Regions:
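Primary recognition of N-terminal secretory signal peptides and signal-anchoring hydrophobic helices
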Residues: 2-11, 20-153
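Hydrophobic membrane-insertion alpha-helices, especially the h-region
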Residues: 13-15
Length: 153
């Protein structure tokens, strides 16, 4: 009887372990660094030391936070499509004046995560997990890589 109870408990534990491992993780963690040098975007000097959402570096590429104001300043828009659960990022929008968003001083290495939702850039769906320079999230904000392919092409 005791052996049967132990076998049943082990079987239940195995089933729970398998079931929990099948649940996809929402986001994968990575590390990025806060940009420490002088930052100029579109001719505007950015005070990254006190920025609420600082520019970050990942794999030697600078990433900018897609806040409402900074995105418009860069001529980029990000729209959430609730039907398809996709973040649509589009370049070429009207640019606005720079509006600083200040916060606490940040420096060093920070934890960033890959989003679990789908992403399209200029109408093309991307496989963000396979990107050399993926789009990621930090402090609830989407960060976009300033690569040649995205910034110029």
């Amino acid at each position: 009887m005791k052996k049967r109870i132990i076998q049943s408990l082990l079987a239940i534990a195995c089933c729970v372990t398998v079931a929990l491992s099948a649940i996809p993780t929402a986001e994968a963690a990575m590390r990025a660094s806060v940009v420490t040098g002088k930052v100029t975007l579109n001719g505007q000097v950015i005070d990254n030391k006190t920025a609420k959402y600082p520019l970050l570096i990942y794999s030697n590429i600078t990433y900018f936070p897609m806040t409402y104001h900074l995105s418009r300043f860069m001529g980029v828009s990000a729209d959430w499509n609730n039907g398809s659960k996709t973040l649509d990022i589009t370049a070429g929008g009207a640019r606005t004046a720079y509006a600083a968003e200040t916060g606490k001083k940040q420096s060093g290495s920070v934890s960033v995560t890959l989003p679990s939702y789908k992403i399209s850039v200029n109408g093309a769906q991307i496989n963000n997990k396979e990107e050399k320079y993926p789009i990621f999230n930090y402090n609830g904000i989407t960060y976009f890589p300033l690569t040649w392919a995205y910034a110029v092409d």
